[in-house]
């Protein structure tokens, strides 16, 4: 179960489906449901309002976050909003595993599935994508009756145990949950040079600043480009605008009027993992998927705090900033200051990159799949459990 609040939750749902297909072929069936927006009008409005806030007024998410926390009481033991749709899905599909990758799809949902199918016939699991604990870590993530709780980091795991009293026996740490191509499509030095010069039309002897955005297109590109332009002899820019066509056209127009700064502009694309490999640093909000790809490819992060930082984004930023492994800006002048410093003292940027590289941890998404499929396997009567064949990894 997922929901399109931002793009990260959907990305992890897609990652689960693709890894299952890669490892087990067609022996394991996966159904992905956008449960919040498909089950009720109120849920659909809440998702749209979240994405509006992310684009236009991140500061407004603080009172919104407090409001959403109330769902933990509303859904304490049953689904309140969208219950009819959810119940129909459970009755018709009869899943052996209900997996939630969204904070608002745990409490009540697991109890409802067990009530319909029988406790012995279904298992329930959560993959929590937060990097750290504290303000922004929603209590809705933690349903105490969960069978398996998967945490991205040990820091976040410890918070779930100490703050929300989750049984330590139910929680494991498994790192990132990225799609298979992230681990498969690694550019060689020659391919990187060719991608920069031919695909992007940029120079291979200048640092590339990646102005990233999520699928919804929240960005401050036009505010940041003038600051980068002042250091056009050292830096060039790769800009992605997501599904924000208005931003795409405005950045394209800015590029035409400012030919001194080398710039490549993209709308929505499926090459983020390639862009990350050719970039020297990325400027992004605290979206967990983009930051996970940046960490995987050792591309240092500047957190975009223009307009405020949303509660969940604070957790990601805190995880990296606590070891001085990233930077954060709240206005364009902050970016200008950083670029001036790195231009005059290149060793300081190298130190940042070294600290960021040290934050990297190894992860094997296939382990998550084995954990979850084994859990689903346990929901079958022992005599009916098929011998699953691994076809790839």
Residue ranges and their predicted role:
Residues 1-393:
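Nucleotide-activated sugar donor-binding and catalytic core shared by glycosyltransferases
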């Amino acid at each position: 179960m997922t929901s399109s609040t931002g793009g990260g939750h959907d990305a992890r749902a897609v990652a689960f489906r693709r890894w299952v297909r890669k490892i087990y072929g067609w022996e394991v069936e996966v159904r992905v449901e956008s449960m919040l927006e498909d089950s009720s009008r109120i849920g659909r409005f809440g998702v749209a309002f979240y994405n509006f806030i992310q684009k236009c007024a991140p500061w407004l998410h603080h009172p919104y976050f407090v409001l959403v926390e109330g769902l933990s009481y509303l859904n304490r033991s049953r689904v309140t909003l969208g219950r009819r749709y959810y119940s129909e899905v459970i009755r018709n599909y009869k899943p052996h595993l209900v997996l939630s990758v969204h904070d608002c799809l745990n409490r009540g949902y697991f109890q409802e599935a067990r009530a319909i199918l029988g406790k012995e016939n279904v298992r329930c699991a959560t993959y929590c994508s937060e990097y750290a604990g504290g303000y922004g870590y929603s209590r809705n993530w933690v349903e105490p009756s969960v069978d398996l709780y998967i945490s991205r980091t040990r820091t976040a795991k410890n918070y779930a145990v100490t703050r929300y009293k989750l049984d330590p026996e139910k929680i494991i740490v498994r790192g990132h949950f990225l799609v298979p191509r992230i681990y498969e499509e690694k550019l060689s030095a020659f391919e990187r040079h060719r991608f920069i010069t031919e695909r992007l039309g940029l120079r291979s002897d200048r640092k590339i600043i990646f102005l990233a955005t999520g699928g919804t297109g929240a960005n401050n590109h036009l505010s940041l480009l003038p600051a980068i332009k002042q250091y056009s002899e050292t830096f060039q820019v790769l800009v992605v605008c997501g599904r924000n066509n208005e931003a795409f056209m405005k950045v394209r127009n800015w590029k035409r009027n400012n030919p001194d700064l080398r710039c490549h502009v993209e709308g929505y694309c499926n090459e983020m993992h390639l862009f990350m490999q050719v970039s020297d640093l990325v400027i992004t909000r605290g979206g967990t998927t983009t930051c996970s790809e940046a960490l995987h490819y050792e591309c240092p992060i500047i957190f975009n705090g223009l307009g405020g930082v949303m509660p969940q984004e604070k957790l990601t930023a805190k995880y990296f900033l606590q070891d001085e492994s990233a930077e954060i800006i709240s206005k364009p002048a902050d970016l200008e200051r950083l670029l001036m410093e790195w231009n005059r003292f290149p060793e300081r940027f190298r130190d940042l990159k070294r600290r960021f590289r040290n934050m990297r941890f190894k992860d094997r998404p296939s382990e998550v799949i084995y954990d979850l499929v084994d859990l689903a396997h346990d929901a079958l009567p022992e005599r009916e459990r098929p011998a699953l064949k691994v076809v790839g990894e």
